[in-house]
């Protein structure tokens, strides 16, 4: 139910025989070692970490893999690519992998709604990967979230995180959500918006860049920290790593090493060029993309999207919880108490 869903996943076509790993789950996955054929990696503690395969979600993990930060901290890490964040959580709960990196909304729904016994201990993303954008032909008439009353807004699906986030933004702006019509467009959202078949849409990159070039107006860019502060009240906890609760004590040295590796990757990516950032991603995930443009997009958003450290921001996490309640994705009164473990890196 997040932006890291099946429609945005770019699963690399490598070693797909590992599907059996998932104990019958209907997930198409791939596994790539953190550092191929190096003695340091071979001697390290082997771990499997699943994530949703969305490009912007995975940048810190791919930098940790390709630049050797996992190996530096004694980990022989395999990144397991799943079709969406829900699949990554299922793999974790089913003991198919050791860790799952997902958006908080996925982890929170699994924890609050179905009782998944997991703990999040590190964060690698602090903003949602969404922007609320007008169609080019409505840019002059729709200038704020309040102006969405009486308009049609395209989302990937009702109940998905883009829908929930829009409802939360409407509430924050004092707009009447009952006066807004939602259209579910799935993967056809970009073209429908560009052609003016709907008034407004909730998009990701590179759709945001393409629409801007076409003359669309950006009402809220959730990938911009200043916009998030203005419209959401601050950062909005996103990607983070979870482990099975019953194993966190046994794995504590490994968990600490993992947080250090990811922390080093977060620092490193801030100094990398766009070309270097794009090159850190597996070629199988970037086939058909303009790598120069992709690198530019990552470099443009990195200071906002990725935190300086892996420490958990509980205020940012509460904003996500409030958006899920506003969208009806978790029950009012449901608590995230116990989901976050701030003892590893603080919070």
Role assignments for model-derived ranges:
Residues 1-20, 29:
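N-terminal secretory signal peptides
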Residues 3-4, 41-185, 199-205, 220-222:
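Short, glycine-/small- and polar/acidic-enriched structural segments
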Residues 35-37:
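N-terminal signal peptide c-region/cleavage motif recognized by signal peptidases
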Residues 59, 126-132, 216-217, 237-241, ...:
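Small-molecule pocket liners
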Residues 188-282:
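Pocket-lining segment of extracytoplasmic ligand-binding domains
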Residues 248-329:
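Secondary-structure end/capping motifs
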Residues 318-347:
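Conserved C-terminal helix/tail region of periplasmic/extracytoplasmic solute-binding proteins
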């Amino acid at each position: 139910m997040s932006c890291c869903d099946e429609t945005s996943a770019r699963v690399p076509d490598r070693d797909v025989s590992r599907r059996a790993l998932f104990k019958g789950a209907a997930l198409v996955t791939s596994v790539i070692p953190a550092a191929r054929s190096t003695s340091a990696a071979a001697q390290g503690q082997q771990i499997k970490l699943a994530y949703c395969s969305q490009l912007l979600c995975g940048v810190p993990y791919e930098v940790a893999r390709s630049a050797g930060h996992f190996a530096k901290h004694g980990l022989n890490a395999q990144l397991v690519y799943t079709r969406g964040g829900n699949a990554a959580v299922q793999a974790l709960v089913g003991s198919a992998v050791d860790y799952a990196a997902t958006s908080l909304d996925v982890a929170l729904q699994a924890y609050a709604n179905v009782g998944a016994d997991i703990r999040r201990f590190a964060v690698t993303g602090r903003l949602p990967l969404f922007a609320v954008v007008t169609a080019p032909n409505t840019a002059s008439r729709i200038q704020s979230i309040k102006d969405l009353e009486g308009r049609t807004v395209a989302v990937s699906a009702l109940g998905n995180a883009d829908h929930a986030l829009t409802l939360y933004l409407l509430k924050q702006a004092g707009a009447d959500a009952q006066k807004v019509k939602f259209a579910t467009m799935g993967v056809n959202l970009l073209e429908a918006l560009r052609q003016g078949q709907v008034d407004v849409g909730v998009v990701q990159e590179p759709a945001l860049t393409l629409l801007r070039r076409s003359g669309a107006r950006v009402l809220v860019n959730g990938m911009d920290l200043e916009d998030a502060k203005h419209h959401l009240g601050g950062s909005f906890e996103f990607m983070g790593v979870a482990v099975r609760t019953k194993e966190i004590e046994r794995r504590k040295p490994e968990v600490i090493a993992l947080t250090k590796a990811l922390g080093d990757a977060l620092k490193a990516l801030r100094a990398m060029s766009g070309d270097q950032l794009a090159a850190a991603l597996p070629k199988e995930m970037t086939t058909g993309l303009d790598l120069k443009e992709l690198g530019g997009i990552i470099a443009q958003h990195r200071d906002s999207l990725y935190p300086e450290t892996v420490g958990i921001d509980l205020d940012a996490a509460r904003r996500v919880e409030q958006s899920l309640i506003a969208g009806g994705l978790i029950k009012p009164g449901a608590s995230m108490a116990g989901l976050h473990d701030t003892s590893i890196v603080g919070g």
